[in-house]
Swiss-Prot record:
Belongs to the universal ribosomal protein uS3 family. One of its GO terms (molecular function) is structural constituent of ribosome. This is Small ribosomal subunit protein uS3. SMART domains: KH. It comes from Granulibacter bethesdensis (strain ATCC BAA-1260 / CGDNIH1). The lineage of its organism: Bacteria, Pseudomonadati, Pseudomonadota, Alphaproteobacteria, Acetobacterales.
Length: 225
């Protein structure tokens, strides 16, 4: 049987870059675990901010964390109080000063991770899965996506037998390496058990002469303090 490889991992070094950007020889495993702890802490603290990506860079031993969020105001807080508390918490975990940047996601409707999390939250609130999927597809296509595919799996609607339902509009060329495909997964914890949500969003093709070929998403958004 065929299986779908993660489209982001397949395109690393082609039109996507890594979310952890640093080099370490013998210290690799410790820094990797530090990254996992920092990401877990941020996702837990900022669950209401619509966090899509957390990019961690370590130039000259000082970590630099960039948070891509749909609601940066929730991260920053009143007069910057929340972001300062967050920075102190990360500094305590990392054992060294941490530089923190917030980048606003201007179109959360075409961010695969945020779309998947939104559908998962609707499933937890007992919204009909077909309605949630169709609404997400319509919003994404309206805001400029060239194609979108959504998979929902599990005991959908409380059914006795788990199944997979999917909905697609436009084209999603998973085999085309120059295609800019965003991918996100989320889990809905319902009273009947867990339901998985997968989202693929095709945003267009990145050509060799495109100056944003390294990472279109990073070039679209300018960091803000």
């Amino acid at each position: 049987m065929g299986h779908k490889v993660n489209p982001i991992g397949l395109r690393l070094g082609i039109n996507r870059t890594w979310d952890s950007r640093w080099y370490a020889g013998g210290d690799y495993s410790r820094l990797l675990h530090d990254d996992l702890k920092l990401r877990g802490h941020l996702r837990k603290k900022l669950s209401g901010a619509g966090v899509s990506r957390v990019v961690i860079e370590r130039p000259a031993k000082k970590p630099r964390v960039t948070i891509y969020a749909a609601r940066p105001g929730v991260v920053i807080g009143k007069k910057g109080q929340d972001i300062e508390a967050l920075r102190k918490g990360l500094t305590g975990m990392a054992g060294t000063d941490v530089a923190l940047n917030i980048v606003e996601i201007r179109k959360p409707e075409i961010d695969a991770t945020l779309v998947a999390e939104n559908i998962a939250q609707q499933l937890e609130r007992r919204v009909a899965f077909r309605r949630a999927m169709k609404r997400a597809v319509q919003s994404a296509m309206r805001l400029g996506a060239q194609g979108i595919r959504i998979n929902c799996s599990g005991r959908l609607g409380g059914a006795e037998i788990a199944r997979i339902e999917w909905y697609r509009e436009g084209r999603v060329p998973l085999h085309t390496l120059r295609a800019d495909i965003d991918y996100g997964v989320a889990t809905a914890k319902t009273t009947y058990g867990t339901c998985g949500v997968k989202v693929w969003i095709f945003k267009g093709e990145i050509l060799a002469q495109d100056p944003m070929a390294q990472d279109r998403r990073a070039a679209e958004q300018a960091p803000q303090r």
